[in-house]
Curated annotation (Swiss-Prot):
Residues 8-249, 261-499 form the ABC transporter domain. SMART domains: AAA. This is Uncharacterized ABC transporter ATP-binding protein YphE. One of its GO terms (molecular function) is ATP binding.
Amino acid sequence: MFTATEAVPVAKVVAGNKRYPGVVALDNVNFTLNKGEVRALLGKNGAGKSTLIRMLTGSERPDSGDIWIGETRLEGDEATLTRRAAELGVRAVYQELSLVEGLTVAENLCLGQWPRRNGMIDYLQMAQDAQRCLQALGVDVSPEQLVSTLSPAQKQLVEIARVMKGEPRVVILDEPTSSLASAEVELVISAVKKMSALGVAVIYVSHRMEEIRRIASCATVMRDGQVAGDVMLENTSTHHIVSLMLGRDHVDIAPVAPQEIVDQAVLEVRALRHKPKLEDISFTLRRGEVLGIAGLLGAGRSELLKAIVGLEEYEQGEIVINGEKITRPDYGDMLKRGIGYTPENRKEAGIIPWLGVDENTVLTNRQKISANGVLQWSTIRRLTEEVMQRMTVKAASSETPIGTLSGGNQQKVVIGRWVYAASQILLLDEPTRGVDIEAKQQIYRIVRELAAEGKSVVFISSEVEELPLVCDRILLLQHGTFSQEFHAPVNVDELMSAILSVH
């Protein structure tokens, strides 16, 4: 068990600078990480966090400045720098997990280093090695279990266990809980505390302040490529941290106040069953209403939206749009009926990263921007620029590849796509996942503006604390049905308690 008696640096960046064409990614950054320390790395998207991480892992070379791992300077050519950083004990777990779904937990943990005996893979030794690694972090899964059968939380823990197998000095966790529900976050927090107790230094990247305070003792806050401040979390307010991130005073958003909603149903779901997660789902969405759906990961929230929009088939039930019954929804038909849908994973299903902002904006409604089958690019750019202005999208131009934008700007384009298409009903699945605080607040504002214009929104989020900030009404999905209903203003503590309760 590691006990810190004095600060022992295990990683340092000294006067680190990095520039890309037209962008200063890091500007004279000094950063120190000590043995056994859990240090949060905070900042808006584009603040320089990712560049700093890439430097520490050796995937980026600084234009000037030094990187030290322990007492060794990290140096070498681009082809060998990443391997050298790994040899010195730097590991990273990114948002997009790299596990091989078709292999077992043990095979993933030992990938590339499978033990051999008499020229053959020693599966018994592999299982024993994997079990020791899992037990060290308190991960309760079988080494023989296929990764494809694990829950998202279990996969995240196996990914963390894999980097721990090499006895690292430094582990970087980039948004490790962004796809996890509140109850499952506890498993990751427990694993990180065990890593720290073993003397491993952890850099923890997250936008969830409550979680950060539970797991980290200190934080480095970045803004515009610089270190805006190094703080001890126990005596630093969240208001001050957010002010460091934004470079100005932060105004907290109050929960939505009760609104007078027109009693006009635009979407009704009646007794919908979609095995294995949804048993008996009924609800009504009214004109100008923002309806939140809360629940644990795996409760079936995403499956519900996919069933409504026609991406997944359901066994029984009715969907009614503006009074018209739809027996078997078809995605293309639902779009024509004025429903817009933003998927849970925008990178896989929401954007085409190599296309420009303009082409991504008009993906779903080519009729508006074509004449005699020919795309009218002047019209496309004009409409896209209008959407970019409305949605406060920051990009060099409407032709900028969307994959180069920050997560928040990508998400605003995805939502803006349906504003452009004049959709009257928006189904938003995790619209603020992986975006920074300022972008979240902009998305809240946009959603409320759309509701004020008479559009109706279903809003799913695993960040329970944000639902009261944007929703007029919240339904709690538990055990395949809606168990409770909350009306604005919603107390987040009551909502959280209801979500975590066991009935």
